[in-house]
Amino acid sequence: MKMMDANEIISFIQKSEKKTPVKVYIKGDLKEVTFPETVQAFVNKKSGVLFGEWSEIKTILDENNKHIVDYVVENDRRNSAIPMLDLKGIKARIEPGAIIRDHVEIGDNAVIMMNATINIGAVIGEGSMIDMNAVLGGRATVGKNCHVGAGAVLAGVIEPPSAKPVIVEDDVVIGANVVVLEGVTVGKGAVVAAGAVVTEDVPPYTVVAGTPARVIKEIDEKTKAKTEIKQELRQLNPEK
């Protein structure tokens, strides 16, 4: 998987068309209303639903107010530069409520739990789990077979573009409510204890804890048993 360069992301945001998409329920004498091709209209003679850009739909509502009796607008963003990732082709388990922006890479058999937030340019390796309410900032990278605990934050780096992003190498376990600051690399097989604030690189196969996080020991068999990654949680339905 290739991490996006910060300047690529900045250019994408700069050049993208800023959108305010809405869903509008309408009621009235709709046979008298003409809808442009740029608006998706699922209507009958008396009611229907519209999908499209707010500026266009507002014009329709204003120009046809004598035919439209009532309407309700659903809107969750304004001048948005980055769409949500199309999840339909992703070979991973993604639970309801996860917010995943476009240009995020998700490896096969990864797991994204409820209310996790994944920003543009982030990379999640095969078989890694991002737990509930965890946040992966822009360009944060998680390797294979990792677990990022509930409420953990991997800080994002888009600006300044020269800054180094968070990199979590393979087989890492990050506990709940951990904060990993910009530029930190968490080495392969390491364990970060719950609640730690990681300000410096974590050596491979070590356990760190505290605020700021410090190495407290090397990985041993007891630690491996307590932080085992269960592949059963990452299995998908067999392809038909």
UniProtKB/Swiss-Prot annotation:
Its EC number is 2.3.1.89. One of its GO terms (molecular function) is tetrahydrodipicolinate N-acetyltransferase activity. This is 2,3,4,5-tetrahydropyridine-2,6-dicarboxylate N-acetyltransferase. NCBIfam families: DapD_Ac. Keywords: Acyltransferase, Amino-acid biosynthesis, Diaminopimelate biosynthesis, Lysine biosynthesis, Repeat, Transferase. Gene3D superfamilies: Hexapeptide repeat proteins, Malonyl-CoA ACP transacylase, ACP-binding. It comes from Bacillus cereus (strain ATCC 14579 / DSM 31 / CCUG 7414 / JCM 2152 / NBRC 15305 / NCIMB 9373 / NCTC 2599 / NRRL B-3711). GO terms for biological process: diaminopimelate biosynthetic process; lysine biosynthetic process via diaminopimelate. It catalyses: (S)-2,3,4,5-tetrahydrodipicolinate + acetyl-CoA + H2O = L-2-acetamido-6-oxoheptanedioate + CoA. The gene is dapH. It is an enzyme of class 2 (transferase).
